[in-house]
Curated annotation (Swiss-Prot):
<feature type="binding site">
    <location>
        <position position="175"/>
    </location>
    <ligand>
        <name>L-aspartate</name>
    </ligand>
</feature>
<dbReference type="InterPro" id="IPR047090">
    <property type="entry name" value="AspRS_core"/>
</dbReference>
<protein>
    <recommendedName>
        <fullName>Aspartate--tRNA ligase</fullName>
        <ecNumber>6.1.1.12</ecNumber>
    </recommendedName>
</protein>
<dbReference type="InterPro" id="IPR004364">
    <property type="entry name" value="Aa-tRNA-synt_II"/>
</dbReference>
<feature type="binding site">
    <location>
        <position position="448"/>
    </location>
    <ligand>
        <name>L-aspartate</name>
    </ligand>
</feature>
<dbReference type="GO" id="GO:0016740">
    <property type="term" value="F:transferase activity"/>
</dbReference>
<comment type="subunit">
    <text>Homodimer.</text>
</comment>
<dbReference type="GO" id="GO:0005737">
    <property type="term" value="C:cytoplasm"/>
</dbReference>
<dbReference type="GO" id="GO:0005524">
    <property type="term" value="F:ATP binding"/>
</dbReference>
<keyword id="KW-0067">ATP-binding</keyword>
<keyword id="KW-0030">Aminoacyl-tRNA synthetase</keyword>
<keyword id="KW-0436">Ligase</keyword>
<dbReference type="InterPro" id="IPR029351">
    <property type="entry name" value="GAD_dom"/>
</dbReference>
<feature type="binding site">
    <location>
        <position position="221"/>
    </location>
    <ligand>
        <name>L-aspartate</name>
    </ligand>
</feature>
<feature type="region of interest" description="Aspartate">
    <location>
        <begin position="199"/>
        <end position="202"/>
    </location>
</feature>
<feature type="binding site">
    <location>
        <begin position="221"/>
        <end position="223"/>
    </location>
    <ligand>
        <name>ATP</name>
    </ligand>
</feature>
<comment type="similarity">
    <text>Belongs to the class-II aminoacyl-tRNA synthetase family. Type 1 subfamily.</text>
</comment>
């Protein structure tokens, strides 16, 4: 039988028509001479009716049905009785009286229910991912992802971008995250690397005159995982020639506006707000600020200076900061014990303590209130606090203050349900530092990557005082997540060489690793720039998920393994011999 429509699309317009449907048994209810079956497919669920009255043979077959059996049915669409109508379903006003049925395949009892609400561990879900993906919630998430990619293709094609693929097997660059390496059989002892991004290839395409490039690009990074990271991920990769940073941002806003409208029917306001990196750190304590709620960081230095509280005074004397966040209504919400728990929380960001006062009609209360009896109004004004609020202070250097209060701000907002989860708040963070200090490497590294162009007014500093340079770079942030980032690129060899020198490369090291690229810059590269948007993260946010695994068909778990296929795995000794490889694995890791 040829399928005539999808189960989830059968509604009143099919009344009195005969349909042929195919799908999975969601559930069965046996009332003796009457059996009801919910048939599920990619579009949804429709109710089937088997009756002794209109087909005894079909009823007998229906008695054999169990959950997840695959069936095809033929029958007539009829209206449900008034009391049987389900207003929550598209198909809720109709049902199909089945005249013919065939069981296409049987199914064992599944390890968890094929339903949105399930009680299963992440690894069990990944082990049986093909079952997990049957759940309507998962199908909806992947449909959102598909809608994003289709809209991206359409928008960029309309704007004269060329979809060009770049290599997966390329050269390792041992800067930044670890590469995934692929041994070469043809060149023993040599390795390809899977690309962490198509960065240099897309810049070469600009040098080749292709003007506007894009790619839905797979990228690979061998790094520790967290909720919004995977060892292999996908980005919407874009590069353009002869466009300024502002023009690239405007083009990106058009793309975001189209995606939001066509995916969720949400209108976003453009132009999107822009703030500098310095402003983001000062106001929100984060370079990816969530602007759906207030509770911004406030500089309390003037209000608390020389009031007699030694912690604050010594911090300010040593060039540090005293900042605070004001928790609306927090005076009654948070007990002393709960505030002490917050103090333990911020210690992970380097803070040594969390000072606090509660604002009352009579002034301030709390452990440090006695130092500020005469400053109560100054503190309330600086913190923008009113009676009933809780003011939380951190005193330290700029980074510790920003990190501590920035993370605390978000944690408290979640606890107090201050965040509108239906809101999509985009913001650009621009004018980044060109370099940032890495505690892991104990040196300065490129804040984005070493191919980022410094601001024009900072070009001289690249040779004399590079750590004061700012970059022509920009990040687009959505609801506190870095959705993507980009920059104007270096298109001149002399600037690229100066950049490598500032990063500590010797001339020989720069030539060995990137000489092939710098040689290309000698042949008339145009000014160019671009950005990359994280497709997985974008889909996660639009689908309302907390983990990108929920919008990837076959992801890895938090240990970078795949419970379904048991990857990574050992390989046959013959395969290693062909690659001239030997393994030396500690016993505890085997």
């Amino acid at each position: 039988m040829r399928r005539t429509t999808y189960a989830g699309l059968v509604d009143e317009k099919y009344l009195d028509q005969e349909v042929c449907l195919k799908g999975w048994v969601q559930k069965r209810r046996n009332l003796g001479n009457l059996i009801f079956v919910d048939l599920r497919d990619i579009e949804g669920i429709v109710q089937l009716v088997f009756s002794q009255e209109f087909n005894p043979e079909a009823l007998k077959v229906a008695e054999q049905l169990r959950s997840e059996y695959v069936i095809e049915v033929k029958g007539k669409v009829v209206a449900r009785g008034e009391k049987a109508i389900n207003p929550n379903m598209r198909t809720g006003k109709v049902e199909v009286e089945v005249s013919d049925i065939e069981i296409l395949n049987k199914a064992k009892t599944t390890p968890f229910d094929i339903a949105d609400d399930i009680n299963a561990s992440d690894d069990l879900r990944l082990q049986y991912r093909y079952l997990d993906l049957r759940r309507p919630e998962m199908q909806k998430a992947l449909m959102i992802r598909n809608r994003i990619t289709q809209t991206v293709h359409s928008y960029l094609d309309e704007n004269h971008f060329l979809d060009i693929e770049t290599p997966y097997l390329t050269r390792s660059t041992p800067e930044g995250a670890r590469d995934y390496l692929v041994p070469s059989r043809v060149y023993p002892g040599h390795f390809y690397a899977l690309p962490q991004s198509p960065q240099l290839f897309k810049q070469l395409l600009m040098g080749a005159g292709y003007d506007r490039y894009y790619q839905i690009a797979r990228c690979f990074r061998d790094e520790d995982l967290r909720g919004d990271r995977q060892p292999e991920f996908t980005q919407i990769d874009i590069e353009t020639s002869f466009m300024s940073a502002e023009e690239i941002q405007e083009m990106t806003e058009g793309l975001l506006k189209r995606v939001m409208k066509e995916t969720l029917d949400v209108d976003i306001k453009t132009p999107i707000q822009r703030i500098t990196w310095n402003e983001a750190m000062d106001r929100f304590g984060s370079d990816k600020p969530d602007i759906r709620f207030g509770m911004e960081l406030k500089d309390m230095s003037g209000a608390v200076r020389n009031a007699g509280f030694k912690v604050f005074d010594m911090t300010l004397e040593n060039g540090g900061q005293v900042k605070a966040i004001t928790v609306p209504g927090g005076a009654d919400k948070y007990s002393r014990k709960q505030i002490e728990e917050k103090q333990e929380y911020i210690k992970r960001f380097g803070a040594k303590g969390l000072a606090w006062v509660k604002v009352t009609d009579d002034g301030l209360t709390g452990p440090i209130a006695k130092f500020f009896t005469e400053r109560a109004e100054d503190i309330k004004e600086a913190a923008e606090a009113k009676s009933g609020d809780l003011i939380l202070f951190v005193a330290s250097n700029r980074k510790v203050v920003a990190d501590s209060l920035g993370y605390l701000r978000v944690a408290i907002a979640k606890e107090m349900d201050m965040i509108n989860k239906d809101e999509f708040a985009f913001i650009w963070v621009v004018d980044w530092p060109l370099f940032e200090y890495s505690e892991e490497f104990d040196r300065y590294i490129a804040a984005h990557h070493p191919f980022t162009m410094p601001n024009e007014e900072d070009l001289d500093l690249l040779e004399t005082d590079p750590h004061k340079c700012h970059a022509q770079s920009y990040d687009i942030v959505l609801n506190g997540y870095e959705l993507g980032g980009g920059s104007i690129r270096i298109h001149r060899r002399d600037i690229q060489e100066a950049m490598f020198k500032a990063l500590g490369f010797t001339k020989e090291k720069a030539e060995e690793q990137f000489g092939w690229f710098m040689d290309a810059l000698d042949f008339g590269f145009p000014p160019h720039g671009g950005l990359a948007l994280g497709l997985d993260r974008f889909a996660m946010l639009l689908a309302g998920k907390d983990n990108i695994r929920e919008v990837i068909a076959f992801p890895k778990n938090s240990k970078a393994s795949e419970p379904l296929t048991h990857a990574p795995s050992t390989v046959a000794p013959k395969q290693l011999d062909e690659l001239y490889l030997k393994t030396d694995v500690p016993e505890e890791d085997e």
